[in-house]
């Protein structure tokens, strides 16, 4: 079913890893989005089996390296969602991107210290921090227009996270319109989900 239903998965339990490894002859990791986790299915099983990166995992790494090393410009990175730890990426990303768009709940999570780090970014014109509607569950229409304008100029786009509580129809407009702009763009795109 789902390996995460078993507590031993997240504990990276060695006995659990060994028992799962006995079900196969080799291990192929296709799960780029969880490679950072120290779970049994990611780092435990490979101890007991010959292990390989799958073709999809290799392609995702190749695409990220392309963005990092030789992006076609302008490069626009949209960082959004609800995880505050994403904020620490704004400044480093501003060193490689032509524009960094900050959306989702992140503008609301930016305390004075986080805002100061954005202000200290090498070229603050590169960083566009979105505005939120009154209940803070979506970005404003002005922010949508500004983000879409930057996206339509881009030759490379990296998108990480949603812009509002998109599962609620009343708060899905920002995500829908910005994602439609990304989808219709002819730019090279790397899209990651999550919050």
Write out the residue ranges for each language-model feature.
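Active-site loop-to-helix "anion-binding N-cap" substructures in soluble metabolic enzymes
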Residues: 2-195
């Amino acid at each position: 079913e789902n390996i995460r239903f078993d507590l031993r998965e997240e504990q990276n339990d060695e006995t659990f890893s060994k028992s799962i490894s006995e079900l196969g002859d080799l291990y192929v990791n296709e799960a780029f989005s969880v490679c950072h986790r120290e779970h049994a299915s990611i780092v435990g099983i490979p101890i007991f089996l010959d292990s390989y990166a799958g073709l999809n995992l290799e392609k995702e790494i190749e695409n990220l390296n392309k963005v990092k090393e030789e992006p076609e410009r302008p490069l626009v990175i949209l960082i959004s969602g609800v995880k505050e730890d994403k904020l620490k990426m704004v400044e480093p990303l501003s060193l490689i991107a032509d524009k960094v768009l900050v959306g989702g709940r992140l503008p609301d999570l930016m305390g004075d210290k986080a805002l100061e780090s954005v202000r200290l970014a090498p070229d603050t014109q590169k960083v566009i921090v979105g505005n939120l509607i009154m209940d803070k569950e979506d970005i404003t229409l002005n922010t949508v227009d500004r983000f879409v304008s930057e996206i339509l100029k881009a030759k490379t786009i990296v998108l990480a996270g949603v812009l509002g509580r998109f599962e609620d129809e009343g708060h899905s407009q920002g995500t829908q319109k910005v994602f439609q702009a990304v989808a219709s763009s002819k730019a090279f795109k790397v899209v990651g989900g999550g919050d």
